[in-house]
Amino acid sequence: MSFTTKVKEELIHLSTGDNNELAAIIKLSGSLGLAHQSLHLSITTENAKIARYIYSFIEDAYVIVPEIRYHQKTNLRKNRVYTVYVEQGVETILADLKLADSFFGLETGIEPQVLSDDNAGRSYLKGAFLAAGSIRDPESGKYQLEIYSVYLDHAQDLAQLMQKFMLDAKTIEHKSGAVTYLQKAEDIMDFLIIIGAMSCKEDFEAIKLLREARNDINRANNAETANIAKTISASMKTINNIIKIMDTIGLESLPIELQQVAQLRVKHPDYSIQQVADALEFPITKSGVNHRLRKINKIADDL
């Protein structure tokens, strides 16, 4: 599973969003058609779970029953494309979400109310990412988050919305549309917090810290750095076990004293056992830290 898919699947397991989220989804992945002299709405995605999420969203909000269709792509990836197809109540949905002007090319940016309200902005960013967002796998060491828009003014409004949350968002125009993007790891982690993907934010940060620790090892050129590398190397097994726990039962399932040690070990892979002991809110002995780390390793081994 790609990191992008992981983020999106975390988002759809949160409580159902509001009209601002749905407006962003439809604006970025929806299209209008005309059949039997009435409008129909098609919303496309390559993720079956997202298709079911959109289906339920529309069904609950408008008491209408859409249809889910799919077809196979003919390119090398051969992914299925799922379409949430709405035949009834399309005019009501467009009016309620203030999208009619957008589809007819009259107003392709973001509603001023969304840009001025933080809660509306968070919901809109969540919907935009679900519809047209991607994150480069943090394991690559090259950090990039992108959201694709058909219209440049929408991409620029997205950047403005992100900048409201102190993110260094930029836009670039392509022949087929425009992209709003983030390139700093800290901005991407903050974006994940803004849209509610807390678990993926923790995973992203853990991977980033591990990469930085490995890079520190590779740059070890003197005795002092070599000692740090030795400490980091010794802590890798525990850090990997902590990540395993985060990905399965969640760090919050551990007793608080184990959570504190685990968080410190991931945040500071270069810390010696004594430094971990000293950094705790209520300092304990080295043997106490070792005892807790052994408990963490055993929990991970038993998973």
UniProtKB/Swiss-Prot annotation:
Q: Which GO terms describe its biological process?
A: cell division; regulation of sporulation
Instruction: Give one Pfam family, short name only.
Output: WhiA_N
Q: Does the keyword Ligase apply?
A: no
Any coiled-coil regions, as ranges: none
List residues annotated as DNA-binding: 272-303
One GO MF term on file is: DNA binding
* Family annotation (InterPro entries): Homing_endonucl, Sporu_reg_WhiA_N_dom, Sporulation_regulator_WhiA, Sporulation_regulator_WhiA_C, WhiA_LAGLIDADG_dom
**Keywords noted in UniProt:** Cell cycle, Cell division, DNA-binding
Keyword set includes DNA-binding: yes
Q: Which residues form the signal peptide?
A: none
Role played: Involved in cell division and chromosome segregation.
Family per record: Belongs to the WhiA family.
- Provide the protein name: Probable cell division protein WhiA
The protein's organism comes out as: Streptococcus pyogenes serotype M3 (strain ATCC BAA-595 / MGAS315)
The primary gene name is whiA
